[in-house]
Amino acid sequence: LRDFPTTYVNRRGERVVTGFDVLLVRRDGQPEPHRTERLANGVRIWIGDPGVYLSPGLYTYTITYRTDRQLGSFADHDELYWNVTGNGWDFPIDDVTAQVFLPGNVPADGIAVEAYTGPQGDRGRDWAAEASTSTATFRTTRGLGPREAADWLLRSCVAPGGARSAVPRDRAALRGAGGPVTGLDALPEADEV
């Protein structure tokens, strides 16, 4: 299972619903059966064949999806707020690392990262981040317990509004990996959005 929130309230108090379509799910590079279920505030992806039990071990899952309305554009910055892991896990996650590649040539001092760890709504500070040209990397500094998540807020203070105008020509990717769950969640090419 992987839950993706698609409904939220923005800073102006308006209800926002984002698009979300699963394009492909893979396990260890091979297509994996999946289905989606609507939730009150999002979409749940059920992954795998319910009649097939996997042997204990490490598996890599890749979820490719299309989403929209994820970038916020403000007077002094653009931002991406992302729930990297989701909160729906019934087991602990040993560690989480996520990386975002920004369009264009954004200098490291034009990127600000803030993050939160813990149960939904918590503002835990168990994380570290670094930025380099057009790239920001975030990682947790402790494992996450069941139903805990890692969220991050990435701000680009260079050419506000540029993220929206650059997206159709460039790729922005969010990669998440964590403990027993390792995968790639991606914001696809904007011409797919």
Segments predicted by a language model, with ranges:
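Lumenal/extracellular ectodomains and adaptor appendage modules
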Residues: L1-V193
